[in-house]
Amino acid sequence: MTNLLTFVVLSTGLDNFKEIRTALAADSRVRLLAGGNDAEQVYEEMLRLKPSSAIITLGANAEQAIMLIKRLALECPATALISAGHETSPDLILRSLRAGARDFLRLPIIGDELKTVLDRTSEFCAGQVAAPKKRGKMIAVFSSKG
């Protein structure tokens, strides 16, 4: 059985959001929880909804999106962050990955690339199962003889 992947999307425009929403809707493993174009609003939704993944588009204001990725990587380490953008300059991709994004998705979305990213995200989320805390005592015994 495949785990359901939940997504929150930060888009730079309505066209980008519609494209991402349509591509995600084509995969049965995915459920879109929320989307928006305001970084603070999306940040609050991320904390409230705790999705398994987030797609953050890098547009004209890429610095704000990269700062959001850094912030989410620190505060939501179990969430797989995916950056996306039309501009696929190596510098921008590298900066987003260094900030904490796990993958970069080129826009417009190509079906095979999206499937690969969703497979990686699914593997990442499956490995995030919290281990139960073991309770016990540690007793150390030292010999009184040298």
Go through each PLM region and give its residues:
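Conserved acidic segment of CheY-like receiver
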Residues: 2-24, 35
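Short hydrophobic/Thr-rich beta-strand motif most characteristic of the beta2 strand and flanking loop
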Residues: 29-37
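Conserved phosphotransfer microenvironments
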Residues: 42, 52-72
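A short, hydrophobic beta-strand element within the central beta-sheet of small alpha/beta folds
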Residues: 78-88
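C-terminal output helix
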Residues: 109-117
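The C-terminal output helix
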Residues: 120-131
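Walker A (P-loop) phosphate-binding motif
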Residues: 129-146
